[in-house]
């Protein structure tokens, strides 16, 4: 690399606009690569320096050049949410349909970065029906990301390919309306409910949007669906199977989930959401109500203690159809395991005697009642220990 090219790279890195202009006027190549094989304009984009990007483009920087990074430089601007830089690159001929190094359209990277960026790409020729290497369009990817649905971005994509988009389904057979009902996105119903000639659109499980709005307590959406059903002179159902139609929510299995509000637990919260989405009627069962925390001080375990705990567990699990024991950062107490004929020889965290005893007793009651049990992480240890499967550290 010659000295002037080094000076250009240094000036860009230091946001020295005047020096950049001076060097470009002197004939330094605006497509200069740095010592790592990266285009110098990439540094200007990383620095979010619109003025330097514009100068480089005006002096001939190629907006479609590919360097050692292999990703198009416009992708750098998209990831940085730099709308001004994106516009400048597109104005100079950047390809809005270019693929990244993983063979995915760049519009896919724009989806989580806001409606303005997606709109800019679409207005400059980005194809909303362009597919990635797995055959997914931007809208179908949004449908698969059921954790959230960006109303503005989704609506923008729908407007580009309206009829096809509104009938698009994800792998669960869900339409935009199903996802909007799940997440309480009233704006989607305001915009598009009237397009559908029935409210009884079913997914693969036979669930309609009304099922999800009722299940998750989105009453305003439920009201909108019922009103639309009246306009269409039809009955709104929550679930349609080959043999039955349900106007209200169908019977749901009652699931007990071991939990304590003060201790909390990420797995418990996540699992409750997942179970509700699978149609479960989930109720937290406080393991501290079975064996109080004070037991951690005494650590007393005998038949009297066990029987008292079992009686409380039976009361709390009465009427339940299944038990879920989620994980936490506490290991099964060795003395509790020993009492139930198990063996624990690991060291992953501090044991919780009271919780171990409470959940071991819950597992015993559930097994005696013939209830299915699911264990997650530490919950696996509880079940395995009760079943006398040794939990040993790796050799």
UniProtKB/Swiss-Prot annotation:
SMART domains: ANK
Ranges: ANK repeats: 3-32, 36-65, 69-98, 101-130, 134-166, 172-201, 205-234
Keywords: ANK repeat, Glutamine amidotransferase, Repeat
Glutamine amidotransferase type-1 domain sequence ranges: 272-395
Residues at the active site: 377
Gene Ontology MF annotations: hydrolase activity
Cited InterPro entries: Ankyrin_rpt, Ankyrin_rpt-contain_sf, Class_I_gatase-like, Multifunctional_ANK_Repeat, Peptidase_C26
Name recorded for this polypeptide: Putative ankyrin repeat protein RF_0950
Organism classification: Bacteria, Pseudomonadati, Pseudomonadota, Alphaproteobacteria, Rickettsiales
């Amino acid at each position: 690399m010659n000295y002037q090219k080094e000076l250009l790279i240094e000036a860009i890195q230091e946001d020295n606009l005047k020096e950049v202009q001076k060097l470009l006027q002197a004939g330094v190549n605006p497509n200069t690569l740095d010592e790592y094989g990266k285009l110098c304009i990439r540094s200007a984009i990383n620095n979010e320096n619109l003025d330097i990007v514009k100068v480089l483009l005006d002096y001939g920087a190629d907006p479609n050049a590919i360097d050692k990074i292999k990703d198009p430089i416009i992708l750098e601007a998209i990831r940085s949410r730099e709308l001004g830089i994106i516009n400048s690159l597109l104005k100079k001929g950047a390809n809005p349909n270019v693929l990244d190094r993983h063979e995915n359209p760049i519009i896919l990277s724009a989806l989580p970065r806001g409606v303005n960026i997606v709109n800019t790409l679409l207005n400059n020729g980005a194809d909303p029906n362009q597919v990635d290497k797995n055959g997914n369009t931007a809208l179908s990817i949004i449908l698969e990301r059921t954790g959230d649905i960006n109303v503005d971005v989704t609506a923008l994509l729908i407007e580009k390919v309206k009829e096809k988009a509104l009938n698009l389904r994800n792998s669960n057979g869900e339409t935009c309306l199903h996802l909007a009902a799940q997440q309480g996105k009233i704006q989607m119903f305001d915009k598009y409910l009237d397009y559908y000639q029935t409210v009884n659109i079913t997914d693969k499980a036979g669930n309609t949007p009304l099922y999800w709005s009722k299940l998750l307590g989105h009453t305003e959406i439920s009201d909108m669906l019922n009103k639309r059903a009246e306009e269409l002179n039809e009955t709104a159902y929550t679930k349609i199977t080959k043999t039955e139609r349900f106007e209200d929510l169908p019977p749901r299995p009652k699931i007990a989930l071991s939990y304590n509000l003060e201790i909390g637990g990420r797995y418990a919260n996540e699992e409750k959401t997942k179970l509700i989405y699978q149609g479960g009627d989930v109720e937290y069962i406080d393991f501290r109500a079975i064996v109080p925390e004070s037991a951690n001080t005494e650590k007393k375990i005998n038949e009297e203690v066990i029987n008292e705990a079992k009686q409380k567990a039976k009361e709390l699990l009465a009427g339940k159809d299944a038990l879920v024991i989620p994980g936490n950062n506490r290991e099964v107490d060795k003395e509790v395991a020993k009492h139930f004929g198990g063996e624990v020889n690991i060291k992953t965290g501090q044991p919780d005697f009271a919780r171990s005893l409470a959940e071991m007793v819950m597992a015993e009651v559930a097994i005696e009642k013939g209830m299915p049990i699911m264990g997650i992480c530490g919950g696996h240890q509880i079940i395995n220990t009760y079943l006398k499967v040794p939990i040993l550290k790796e050799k």
